[in-house]
Amino acid sequence: MAYDHTQSVKEVLRHVLFRCGLSETLDVVRHWRGHYTKHTRERDMTGIFSQIYANGAWVMRENQDSLSGVGSTQVATRELSTQLSDFLREVGCRRLVDIGCGDFNWMRSVEGDFDYVGIDVVPKVIEENAAHHGNGRRRFLCADATRQLSVTGDVALCREVLFHLSFKDGLSLLRNVRSASFRYVLFTTDNAVWFNSDIRSGDFRRINLRRSPYGLPAPLRELADDKVSKGRVLGVWPGTALPG
């Protein structure tokens, strides 16, 4: 996969603005473009992401079928759902823990004989998921996995979550997932960028998990997840590959 040098340079500039305390400059630009940015003023994870959902900050298209963003729509995830179903069957997954499950829109299409635990930091999202999708083998928990991860299983899925977290919060999440002793962990990574920028949690940028400060080894395999952004994949690592 060739690097996207233009995007990577943008990430360098984003990082410089963040380090200089000028991230609000980007908020002004986004506001001019019609994007909701008030969630960046919140100081805790629940407040940040509750504001995002309440105000449709991740709804970018008319008739979008997911509040969790364009990447969680059925159109964007049709092939990924099939790949993930095949992988879970192959490794004999008995419990899947979905960290940052969002509104459960695309995961409804993933098939397999496993128990499912969806975790998200937004209480209302979890309440609605439990009411509409919960059953004996599918449950939803409201928790902040950057602070503590109290459940474990065979496989942990954490799709596009790190893209929205600061270095500090992202690395804390990785350590908590490592401590939970999953056999396999799946994280979104973007092979097209060669520089990772730091951000305020709740913002967004593309990251390459093989680059600093994450420094993960090459994944065991990659599930194509590039319908929204070329170069994006869902990487599969052994749980022991994460920083402790």
Which residues does each predicted region cover?
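A conserved beta-strand element that flanks and buttresses the S-adenosyl-L-methionine
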Residues: 157
